[in-house]
Amino acid sequence: MAGKGVGSRLSTLFLLVLLVITIGMMQVQVAEGRMCKTPSGKFKGYCVNNTNCKNVCRTEGFPTGSCDFHVAGRKCYCYKPCP
């Protein structure tokens, strides 16, 4: 019976260490992967289709874009990695 307790403790300790490492890696990715948002200068009209917004943003030199809620409805915003 004593063997089960030690094995269980080691398993728990291993999972705890793995969880701490995973959380640490996630925080680094969030900090490095922060995206800056800018309203599209070329997109016209109400933004319904993310694909259209993304394509317009690419013509403006941004890697991606999406329709996001704005005070007046949905608007096309372009995204790029923050400096």
Curated annotation (Swiss-Prot):
S-S pairs: 36-82, 47-67, 53-76, 57-78
Principal subcellular localisation of the protein: secreted
GO biological process: defense response to fungus; killing of cells of another organism
Compartment list: Secreted
Leader sequence segment: 1-33
Keywords of this entry: Antimicrobial, Disulfide bond, Fungicide, Plant defense, Secreted, Signal
InterPro entries given in the database record: Defensin_plant, Scorpion_toxin-like, Scorpion_toxin-like_sf
Assigned GO CC terms: extracellular region
Alphabetical list of Pfam families matching this protein: Gamma-thionin
Family that this chain belongs to: Belongs to the DEFL family.
General function of this protein: Plant defense peptide. Has antifungal activity against B.cinera, F.oxysporum, F.solani and H.annosum with IC(50) values of 0.4 ug/ml, 2.9 ug/ml, 0.9 ug/ml and 1.4 ug/ml, respectively. Has modest antifungal activity against C.albicans and T.reesei. Causes thickening of F.oxysporum hyphae and an increase in their branching. Lacks antibacterial activity against the Gram-negative bacteria E.coli and E.carotovora.
Protein name: Defensin-1
Species whose genome carries this gene: Pinus sylvestris
Source taxonomy: Eukaryota, Viridiplantae, Streptophyta, Embryophyta, Tracheophyta
Gene this chain is encoded by: Def1
